Amino acid sequence: MQTAIHFEGDQAYICVSDHGKIKEEEPVSYGRSRVEFVIQTAKAQEEGKIAVVFDDATGKIVKDAEEQCIRSGLQQGQVNFFTKEEAALGVVLFRGDNLAKGNTGIFDYTRKHFVYYEVKKQKDSVIVEAKDYTEQIKHAVTDQEKDAAFLTIIKQALARGITTTIYLCGEGFDGNWFSQSTNALCIGRRVFMGKHLFASGAAYLCANRQGEQKVPATVNHTTISQIGLVVHHHGRDMFCPLIMEGKPWEESRGEMEI
């Protein structure tokens, strides 16, 4: 059994994966410390792993959280941290979206930001890109203003390629303020809404981390293609890769002897 926790604002959205089925639980207030909540959840769970999605999952925040989990007595690897980009990929895999027919998009509207995540297939890889539209909607106050701003964002975000599936996630979508923009979204697309999306994606990834997922995936903090040199060797040009695709930029290193 795996438990996935997505922290958003003062709420923890939880999904439990057991024998291939993912169940959503009621959101709970986690108190002052997200990491302490994770530790308590892990210790209360008799077996399995914990998947965690932080809205601000920078390398330092994740490293500090991992060290705190180890100091509390949890085993290495018992808690797995995911970015929202990674969880977005998990959503697509869990829902079974067919990227060969079109892209999948997730509009994430929280108290602090408005971000669009696009998941698309590119040759043999799956690409996850994030675009921040917070500036375009943060000054909208009335329902009409937010609806108009969201409609403009939709036109910009979906201008490239074919998008067949859309998800709306976050507290910002509470209420019925987006009637005009929803009409534009639903033309030729499947549209779903829920607050447990990122938790369900992380639960799927955690459950299948050692499984059969074969599709290479890259997100916007990783390399999207091989990086290398073309060298002339024994009378012909050949490409020598230094860094493979899908590797974090900050951790990527490559060298060769000539």
Enumerate the predicted regions with their spans:
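Glycine-rich phosphate-binding loops at beta-strand->alpha-helix junctions
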Residues: 52-61, 154-183, 190, 194-195
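Glycine-rich phosphate-binding loop plus the immediately following alpha-helix
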Residues: 121-152, 205, 250-258
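Gly/Thr-rich phosphate-binding beta-strand-loop-beta motif of the actin/hexokinase/Hsp70
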Residues: 1-25, 93-131
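Acidic, glycine/GT-rich loop-and beta-edge segments that sit at the periphery of enzyme/chaperone cores
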Residues: 204-258
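Conserved phosphate-binding catalytic cores of ATP/NTP-utilizing and phosphoryl-transfer enzymes
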Residues: 1-3, 76-109, 197-218
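Short beta-strand-loop/turn "lid" adjacent to the catalytic site in phosphate-handling enzymes
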Residues: 41-68
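N-terminal phosphate-binding loop and adjacent alpha-helix
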Residues: 22-42, 50, 136-150
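Phosphate/pyrophosphate-binding loops at sites that engage ATP/ADP/AMP, CoA/4′-phosphopantetheine
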Residues: 38-50, 95-96, 148-165
